[in-house]
Amino acid sequence: MVNIRENAARILPAALMAGAALFMISPVVIVLTGSLTDGIGPYIDFFVWQPAQLRAMCNSILIALCVSVGTVLVSVPAAYVFAKVRFRGRGFLFYLYIIVMMMPFSVTLLPQYILSREIGIYDTPLSMILPGIFAPFAAFLLTQMMKSIPDEILEAVRLETDSPWGLLWYVLIPTVRPGIVCAAALVFAEYWNAVAEPLVLMESAEQLPMAVVLDTVGGADAAAYTAVILFCAVPLFLFSYFETEIMEGLGAYRLK
């Protein structure tokens, strides 16, 4: 009787976790099998016979990739300045970043629309890319990670190199790599799935990303529709691949 209870105590949690895992992965399996109902025909149609859909997918890749890479290039030096460079007004500027980050999305969308009209980038990918690059979330996240690096280590490195870029490249970037990957992945997923921004900042069908034109794809053809949905689920695979870095990066997402 004791052995039965011990076995049940071990098997039941494992069975529950396996059931939960199957339940969570079932949407991906359903979409994958649905897209292969007609073989690989829907995928061939997508890349060969549907230029509008392919263009929308390329727009999504262009916007999400440019914003994620640009965000890292801008946020890493900004985080270094906030975390390790002392100057008058640093605290005020940093908390201004936090205030902007906490603003409702709709509050910043209208200024983006007006500014894109004024500088001539309305109805182009730049209307989404430029504001996205300077979004404060990534800088805030990386600042928290860089604050945890002891100043003594940085002083020792400064004895070897006088260049702040050398310090950034050889010490800070390797140390905060999980935060960089986390920020890039989250920003990529955000702009890959963006719907409101392109609806406000773009009007030409040729400029719209896949998340917006998804409703026009497939029609009665369920296989084609599920094939496109699978392409739109790219961030899921991205998160799975970088799971460790993302979790470590989110662990540093706290005020110090």
Over which residues does each language-model region extend?
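A structural signal for multi-pass alpha-helical bundles of membrane permease subunits
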Residues: 3-256
